[in-house]
Amino acid sequence: MSETLERHAFGAEVGRLLDLVVHALYSEREIFLRELVANAADAVDRRRFGALTDPALSLPADAKVRIRPDKAARTLAISDPGIGMSKEDLAQNLGTIARSGTRAFSQSLADAKPDERPSLIGQFGVGFYSAFMVADRVEVTSRKAGSDEAWTWASEGQGEYTLSPATRAEPGTDVVLHIKADADEYLEPLRLETIVRKWADHITVPITLLRDGEEVSGNEGTALWRKPKSEVSEEAYTAFYRHVTHNFDAPWATLHWRAEGALDFTALLFIPGMKPFLAVEEERESRVRLHVRRMFITDEAGLLPSWLRFVQGVVDTEDLPLNVSREMLQATPVLARIRRAVTGKVMAELKSRAKDAESYATFWQAFGPVLKEGIWEDAEHRDDIAALLRFRSTAVEGWTSFADYVSRMKPNQEAIYILVGDDAAALARSAQIEGFRARGIEVLLLSDHVDAFWPERLDKFDGKPIRSITQSADDLSAFAPEGEAAGEAADLTELLPKLKEILKDDVAEVRASQRLVESAVLLSASSGGPDLQMQRLLRRAGRGFGAGLPVLELNPRHALVRRIAERARAGEDVGEAAQTLLDLAHVQGGDPPRDPVAFARRVAAALAAQA
């Protein structure tokens, strides 16, 4: 056998990650059994689905997950008759870790609070490796359904694993844990039974446990979603939620209903109470599980649009054939009708829950950026989503909505004003809002990464145009400032054309500003051009050619501008001053100066002249 034993190193960073899993989650060691049983049940479901189109994959009549502790040998085995794994599958699935990246998992685990760490295991797809919390050696013997070959993967979690030929009478997988000296409790049948009932009671695949030489049932095995709501406790909902999401919190919202009539389906959906550590921004597809008459078919049916992908759970229907293929699913009108109905139900729930501002703020902070994607992607639901959006504002603390903003608009105000950037706190201090604040006009502050895009698809709310203040300087002429303006306005007749000539390659226009009160300069968007934040993103993406040129605005009442205007009227050279003003505008907007070295030199020279 030694001649055929293959030794392999784990994928990059796996050694460090294994150490993190073992030590950071030590106090939650029981979750290893949850993860291994869930993997086994999933393998059974996948073989059952495959058998619908390939009879050779048919499951045995007594298909179940078996848990067998052996105190004498100090081993714990979890066996399943599922789809199994080939040699290549073992190397790919167990020899490398976390498709989403070990570095991301490691960082999240290091940053998480102790009570948040267990949920990371399932979210990052590293559940199998939790076995090393209780075992100093793990052996996985597997035979893929449809193949006669079996292989054993083995590791002590020390940076390498081995692969060797094996024998297994039937397709499926055996995971054997050699239990550590300090983990004796996981050899006790009663302790194992308690864990299974806690974490896996709602898995529909039967689970049995070897106790006193006899197999006893470990789980109820009923489809929770098939039960009437009146028969399901909050504790049962929470347990099932934790099973499908790998979270340890309680759901923010639970939706459980039966649709009958033109469509016949049952749904049990959850909106999580916290944002997963594996950011939903990175996963673009909905993973709600589709079942047909209780049988799992796929979690890739797209039962919800991508902008509701944070919703998790199960939809079980009678209106599709059991042998439906994943390819056929995308073409069947039944699925489209179910998708429409489920989406409508979730939207109605969000609308209802939004009435509780404090509770809704919890949801919004976790999933608001994802919901905003629907404004860009989904014209059918655009207006409904708009009513659910929440923003920071210059007028109120906390979150506010478009509807609340409209209720506070000044009598002669026609538009809803927004400012888009990278940081809400920085936006609140931005020079862009000085003129609006001086006139008592509220501005909504948008700082999520998607905020640069979706306003292009939503041009109004409740009949009120939505305008970026970087494009709306002219609107201020209709409002008088509250209080006296500070300082005398400079005559910019000589200065403006000189600056425009000097900066002709960098700005579309140079003009006096209505919006500046305290700051000397700012950049705004050209009329008809993209918003400043969109220009910024285009430049970062190397697509500056599509960004257009900004407008440089000067505050004629600012001492610096007045001094430069005097020099221009006196016929002095203002070339250096022009470059410095433009760089100041870039820095004030949160961007670096175009040439940091030259900018620093000019500033140093100006300070030296004042010394």
From Swiss-Prot:
Keyword Nucleotide-binding: yes
Localisation: Cytoplasm
C, as annotated region: 537-611
Annotated segments matching region B: 327-536
Keywords, comma-separated and alphabetical: ATP-binding, Chaperone, Cytoplasm, Nucleotide-binding, Stress response
GO cellular component: cytoplasm
A: annotated segments: 1-326
One MF annotation (Gene Ontology) recorded for this entry: unfolded protein binding
Coiled-coil segments on the chain, per record: none
Family: Belongs to the heat shock protein 90 family.
Function, as annotated: Molecular chaperone. Has ATPase activity.
Subunit (UniProt): Homodimer.
HAMAP family (alphabetical): HSP90 (MF_00505)
PANTHER family named in the record: HEAT SHOCK PROTEIN 90 FAMILY MEMBER
Protein name, per record: Chaperone protein HtpG
Gene name as annotated: htpG
